């Protein structure tokens, strides 16, 4: 039988989808080459309302395909499944299986049971059954991998539904994490992202407050690992020893995603974020003093209940001061069951939209100005997989700088995902850069692995097509 997994939401879900694919293939399922398959798995997100709406809209489209015989079974997992449970069957009785965030490994058995009994099956666990990293995995990338160091979250942010769906923080032992990274590197992986809901509280379960900084140093020392990243930290628990470890460990990339959410102390207090703007700015200042070329990115929520124009101006002022390389900006979305959803002074949508547009305009200007500083500089890129299959043979590629910036460039030599290329930047836009023809190329074992997994006709691969310079 064939399968496909559609993923909504955050990096946690992307990594969970790799595990879902792994347990299915371990049972003999084969990945479909299209969006249609015998089994369609939807790995859902519950963080914002628009994710809910998109999911239920897609379920309606799948009904027609199921009636036409193009799909045999539909399974729904992830945070929305954990939250809505029986509601999914009420809204979409054609769904066959609903499973939660804590029991990914149960999916094959639930699918078998549903086929045998010709009934819908639901299994939601309220506690972690098996740590996801102990399950089989099917990774899409030959050069980059997620490695989970913890699951769950002990914070109580008033806008966030994740702790109630993912549970309290559970930490993996350092030895297990390092062993997984070593195994990945032996398979050709060059880049690892350490993944957790709040990575810098890693170690809380075994009482070691310096555990995350120590983990960075030990992981970065693994021979063959060229790039090491992590996401996401929390400003309240972020400490100097992590910045020191980033500075001292060559493999750790000069990039830091530090969620702000708001620049207003009053709103941060209402969000129950446990830090204030001054603490945030102190972290940024220390990071830049110790790692001058570091790129800082962030998350910002616009329109939190009770946000005044003065509060919003505090956010704009902080954004202008910090000058983020990029920012994930969101309009506040009330989630049922969270304290913020029942707070007074919910902000009208037109005001939220107007503020959101102003923030986006400011951040885009800053991102463009920061990117323009790179024009004329030479940067080393990790070649990544592009999205335009019709331009895979025209010697145009895409890659990421150590700071995480996206660069489109040309190369007269054949490149594979996982190879490295050095280019000179000739053009900048807010969200990407353009490089001249590659100056040097470094082929890697990761590129060799890509060749082994792909036929030679597509081996010239990775171009997106060069954006026009306007």
Swiss-Prot record:
GO terms for cellular component: cytosol. Binds 2 [4Fe-4S] clusters. One cluster is coordinated with 3 cysteines and an exchangeable S-adenosyl-L-methionine. The gene is miaB. This is tRNA-2-methylthio-N(6)-dimethylallyladenosine synthase. HAMAP family: tRNA_metthiotr_MiaB. GO terms for molecular function: 4 iron, 4 sulfur cluster binding; metal ion binding; N6-isopentenyladenosine methylthiotransferase activity. It catalyses: N(6)-dimethylallyladenosine(37) in tRNA + (sulfur carrier)-SH + AH2 + 2 S-adenosyl-L-methionine = 2-methylsulfanyl-N(6)-dimethylallyladenosine(37) in tRNA + (sulfur carrier)-H + 5'-deoxyadenosine + L-methionine + A + S-adenosyl-L-homocysteine + 2 H(+). It is an enzyme of class 2 (transferase). Monomer. It comes from Tropheryma whipplei (strain TW08/27) (Whipple's bacillus). Keywords: 4Fe-4S, Cytoplasm, Iron, Iron-sulfur, Metal-binding, S-adenosyl-L-methionine, Transferase, tRNA processing. Residues 139-369 form the Radical SAM core domain. It is found in: Cytoplasm. SUPFAM superfamilies: Radical SAM enzymes (SSF102114). Residues 372-439 form the TRAM domain.
